[in-house]
């Protein structure tokens, strides 16, 4: 029995050469191609004993190796399994718990530190036969109130202070005035 997937590169190359196929270098990118070719050669229906094909008459020049081909057909049991790859790759099973969808509308909203409320789906109501939807996403009142409580962000304050100092420095150097005089 021959397990094509478990053959090393050298053994794969030897098997192909035994069957009359001259493979090139076996690389990870060409390995699957050579495995398929080996399976083709092993599975092909049995014919007469090895046959020597004479030189072909074509217009182009040929090498002496290509002029004679040896066709050997072997019968054998082939295992086309991926047992080796199954053993190596054990994927963790997907969890059955449902993941909550991320609310992309409120990514910039930072809740105040206090009580934590359970996340809920946005409320959608149809009123008086019209198609108006009221959404519970980031209410404008909440963001304005939290901004008033916190004031300006520290980074913004530092940036304004830095720009102010640079403007004062440029003004003093252009006017050639001393800082304390």
From Swiss-Prot:
Top-level taxonomic group: Eukaryota
Pfam families named among the record's database cross-references: LEM
Signal peptide segment: none
SMART domains: LEM
Keywords of this entry: Membrane, Signal-anchor, Transmembrane, Transmembrane helix
CDD domains membership: LEM_LAP2_LEMD1 (cd12940)
Disulphide bridges, residue numbers: none
Regions that span the bilayer: 152-172
Coiled-coil segments on the chain, per record: none
Membrane in keyword set: yes
Topology in membrane: Single-pass membrane protein
InterPro entries listed in its UniProt record: LEM/LEM-like_dom_sf (IPR011015), LEM_dom (IPR003887), LEM_domain (IPR051656)
Tissue: Testis-specific. Isoform 6 is detected in 17 of 18 colon cancer tissues examined.
Domain LEM: start-end pairs: 1-45
UniProt-listed SUPFAM superfamilies: LEM domain
The UniProt record lists the keyword Electron transport: no
Cellular compartment(s): Membrane
Any one GO CC term of the record: membrane
Name of this chain's protein: LEM domain-containing protein 1
Encoding gene (name): LEMD1
């Amino acid at each position: 029995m021959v397990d094509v997937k478990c053959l090393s590169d050298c053994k794969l190359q030897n098997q192909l050469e035994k069957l009359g196929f001259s493979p090139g270098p076996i690389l990870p990118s060409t390995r699957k191609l050579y495995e398929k070719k080996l399976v083709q050669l092993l599975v092909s229906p049995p014919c007469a004993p090895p046959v020597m094909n004479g030189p072909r008459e074509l217009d182009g020049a040929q090498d002496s190796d290509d002029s004679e081909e040896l066709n050997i057909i072997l019968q054998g049991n082939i295992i086309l399994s991926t047992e080796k790859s199954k053993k190596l790759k054990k994927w963790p099973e997907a969890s059955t718990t449902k993941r909550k969808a991320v609310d992309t509308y409120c990514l910039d909203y930072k809740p105040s530190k206090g009580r934590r409320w359970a996340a809920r789906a946005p409320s959608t109501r149809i009123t008086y036969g019209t198609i108006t939807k009221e959404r519970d996403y980031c209410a404008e009142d909440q963001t304005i109130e939290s901004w008033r409580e916190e004031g300006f962000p520290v980074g913004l304050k530092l940036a304004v202070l830095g720009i102010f100092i640079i403007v004062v420095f440029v003004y003093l150097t252009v006017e050639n005035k001393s800082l304390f005089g």
